[in-house]
Amino acid sequence: MQSDIVLSSRVRLARNYADLPFDLASEPEQAETCILRTLSALRQAGLEEQYDLLRLRDMSDVSRRAMEESHLVSRDLLRSPETAAVLVKRDSSVSIMMNEDDHLRIQAVRTGDDLLSAAQACFCVDDALSRQNEFAFDQQLGYLTAFPTNAGTGMRASLLLHLPLLTRSKQMGNVGQMVAKVGLNIRGVYGEGAEALGNIYQISNQVTLGRTEQELITTVEAVGQRLTMMEQNLEEKALTTAKIETEDAVQRAFGILTHARILPHGEFYQMYSNLRLGATMGLLPLSVQKVDEVLDQAQDAHLCIYAGETLSGQALDAARADRVRELLGE
């Protein structure tokens, strides 16, 4: 699959220690037991030195939000800063969220289409932890989790895809139906509700019960390949039937992003999508990787950290414009 359509691959495993109650958010002593037990298991496996332990209560709000923007932690984890923590691998490829809805959410992310590698990284951590501890498991149901939809393998496999032309041609309704037929879900990554800012979507399995890990990965991969092919077909069509319009949209986006002095959140995502499309189609002397770096660094919390102060309103939009110009000028 082409990684210029697929931004990233993620696999996440939900695990719970057999002797601890499920909801630890209101149980600080047992939540601490979960953290220390996980650290100890990594130490026994010789993996502790590869990870940094970050307790949310010791972090600023903006630092927590920056981790969410980087997809290292979930928004749900941020709800319980007093008890939640995360172990982040030094290269940021693996994170172990502790004391969210489940005791552990083991997550691995890879650039482009690489679900198998992400899964292998998760299972490496899972094996290390399970050698020292017993996880909640039922012979018929599989791994037991806080939410029944996560029971079974406890695995969520997902791909992030940039689908601007499928969106503009109003095919996402049909895409949603196609995805649902094979037990997957599709949603916009940025924005609220049905909104998909930047035309970035996530596809993932809806249920984990009754299917093996390999079956889940294969299904998500197959749908990702299908969507990639559909988007690429529209790219080829655009180059033959709407080349001047496509080039105009791409060059306008490049002009705005390299010259704007104020860049609101919504406008940035629109321009980013056109810029990424141009990079994907070879219409700009920019790599897709550079464009995606701009996406990461233009997020609100990242901008505040870069500026060294809390920003809001027009000051935040001005900082976004400055940072984007800086990155695209490198």
What do the PLM-derived regions correspond to, one by one?
Residues 1-140, 155, 167-169, 174-176, ...:
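Long, Pro/Ser/Thr-rich low-complexity/intrinsically disordered regulatory tracts in eukaryotic proteins
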Residues 159-165:
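Alpha-helical support elements that line or immediately flank enzyme active sites
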Residues 142-159:
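Conserved phosphate/anionic-ligand binding catalytic regions in large, soluble enzymes, centered on
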